[in-house]
Structures are given as structure tokens and as C-alpha cells.
UniProtKB/Swiss-Prot annotation:
It comes from Caldicellulosiruptor bescii (strain ATCC BAA-1888 / DSM 6725 / KCTC 15123 / Z-1320) (Anaerocellum thermophilum). This is Ribosomal protein L11 methyltransferase. S-adenosyl-L-methionine binds at residues 155, 176, 198, 239. SUPFAM superfamilies: S-adenosyl-L-methionine-dependent methyltransferases. InterPro entries: Ribosomal_L11_MeTrfase_PrmA, Ribosomal_PrmA_MeTrfase, SAM-dependent_MTases_sf.
Length: 304
């Protein structure tokens, strides 16, 4: 399978805002190259400092499926960059487009991706030899072409929430599972049953492989959000984007047990109020709102 790589030459100041735009537009993965990335906690940790050459600019690379309308997508990115430039210095803002093979991108991840600790969870690349210390829970991961490496702020927020809200014996539904990272973490924290769904066939395959890597039994299937799901769960988790979360808020109560938890993330800060209004409209009680960088997590519950 081939993918479009969209590369934007920008400033370190603007890289997070541009990453948010690209994720919103459906990027399956984003890689940031800048002069600070080596020292940032919870982000890429370089295997070899020789991989990194100091530059006076940053580059944000995003990967989109071959089926994308690349002309329309590029035009939309240009318009969003113009809007962003009104309040932040985006530098040159030059956009480059190329095609890459799935294998090439998968190998590129390995240059930057190393173990990441999030609470009691350690996300470990499948190719790394890593031994857990103390009571740490290891989640092995090969992200492939699916979103969810454990390094993105929205994923970190979700993993922290899973550690807080998922208890042994609970039933968990992961909507938009991506790499399967959240579903696997829930199972590692002794959830009784975990169902993981994604509309993307590539994500389903990647999640299945990651479940095998971790030796956990998870039901994984292609599905559009909660459509056709008749069971009810103690925890529903969705790390997607604001618009889809608002759509999901209309139906999530159908798959939640009474007084149980909906963990939602992937919400950029300027869309938080829209999401909260949607939850209020659909009678979801807000339990917790948490922010990390420009990303937000909302925990709500189904009231009786």
C-alpha cells in the first residue's frame, strides 16, 4: 500500500498547531523534526543523536491514505495555514507532497520511537528489548500505519484515564482503536472483555497484530463507531477528533451501562466548548476535563 507524505516547513513555535490541523484532517501519523525534540518528555527519543542535525526551522510530516483527494487536501491545508499565520509565526509554511510505501514509513518510525512511560504503563516498540522495573505494565506496540503510538498528547491523556477508571472485571469498548494501544492497555489492567472497533481495515489488522504481540484476547472488528453494537459496557473510550466525538455523544449511551464512564480525547482546545455543549445536549454528565498541551480529554458518564 502507498501513502501520501505531506511535509510542511515551519517554525518550532507553530509545529503543535500544524500537527493539530493535520490530525484533524485525517492524518494517520505525524512526525515532527525540530531542534528540541530530543529533550521533550513523552515524545520521540532518538536512538542516536547522529540521526539529528540542527536546523533553523522545524518540519512537520503527515501521512495520508493513497485514497485521499490530495489536491483538495493540500488546498485545505494551505487555507488552514493562512488562518494559523494570523496568530502565530509559521515561517515559510512550504508544503511538499510525495508518495511513500507502507514499508518505508514503517521503517522511518523505528528511527525515533523508543519506550515511553505513562503512569504505570510503559509503551515499548516491538523491536526493543526492554525489561520492566517494579510494577510497571508493558504494552508492546508496532504502530505500523495506524494512529496511536503512546507519544501523542491525546493518547497519553487516554492512557492516564484508563489507569484511573478501568477496574478488574469491567467490560470496555474502544471506538476508533487505531493501533489498539488503548484496548490492549485496558486488557492489561484486567478488563474482563474488550471490544475494539475501527472503520479502517489497516487499523484493524495492526490492532490484531499488536494484541498478539501482547498475548491478550481482544475482539477487534471493522465497524462505524457504535453502529450495530447491542452489548453494554462499563467504559467506552474514544481517542478520535472533536466532530466525531460529538456525533458519538448522541449514541454512546446505548452502549453504556447506567452510571458508567465515557472517556473521550483527541479534542483540540478550541473545540472543547463545542464538545461540552454536545455532551450537555445529549445528557452526559461531565466527570472530568483534563488538558495536555493543546489537547483535551473529557470524561463523562451516563446518568440514570
Amino acid at each position: 500500500m502507498r501513502w501520501y507524505e505531506i511535509s510542511i516547513k515551519t517554525t518550532e513555535e507553530a509545529e503543535d498547531a500544524i500537527s493539530n490541523i493535520l490530525y484533524e484532517l485525517g492524518a494517520n501519523g505525524v512526525v515532527i523534526e525540530d531542534n528540541e525534540i530530543v529533550t521533550r518528555p513523552n515524545l520521540w527519543d532518538y536512538i542516536d543523536e547522529n540521526q539529528f542535525t540542527k536546523k533553523d526551522y522545524a518540519r512537520v510530516c503527515a501521512y495520508f491514505p493513497e485514497s485521499s483527494n490530495i489536491l483538495e487536501l493540500t488546498h485545505t491545508i494551505e487555507e488552514r495555514l493562512k488562518e494559523t499565520a494570523k496568530y502565530i509565526d509559521i515561517g515559510e509554511g512550504k508544503i511538499s507532497v510525495s508518495e511513500v510505501n507502507e514499508k518505508d514509513w514503517a521503517e522511518e518510525w523505528k528511527k525515533y520511537y523508543k519506550p515511553v512511560e505513562i503512569g504505570n504503563i510503559v509503551i515499548v516498540p516491538s523491536w526493543e528489548d526492554y525489561k520492566a522495573e517494579g510494577n510497571k505494565t508493558i504494552v508492546k506496540l508496532d504502530p505500523g500505519m495506524a494512529f496511536g503510538t503512546g507519544t501523542h498528547e491525546s493518547t497519553i491523556l487516554c492512557l492516564e484515564a484508563i489507569q484511573k477508571y478501568v477496574k478488574p472485571g469491567m467490560d470496555v469498548l474502544d471506538v476508533g482503536t487505531g493501533s489498539g494501544i488503548l484496548a490492549i492497555a485496558a486488557k492489561k489492567f484486567l478488563a474482563r472483555r474488550v471490544l475494539a472497533v475501527d472503520i479502517d481495515e489497516v487499523a484493524v489488522k495492526v490492532a490484531e497484530e499488536n494484541a498478539r504481540l501482547n498475548g491478550v484476547e481482544i475482539e477487534i472488528k471493522k465497524n462505524d463507531l457504535v453502529e450495530g453494537i447491542e452489548e453494554k459496557f462499563d467504559v467506552v473510550v474514544a481517542n478520535i477528533v472533536a466532530d466525531i466525538i460529538m456525533r458519538l455523544s448522541r449514541d454512546v449511551k446505548k452502549v453504556l451501562k447506567d452510571d458508567r464512564i465515557f472517556i473521550s480525547s483527541g479534542i483540540i482546545e478550541d473545540r472543547l466548548e463545542d464538545v461540552l455543549k454536545s455532551f450537555e445536549k445529549n445528557s452526559l454528565e461531565i466527570v472530568e476535563v483534563k488538558k495536555l498541551g493543546t489537547w483535551c480529554l473529557v470524561v463523562s458518564k451516563k446518568t440514570v
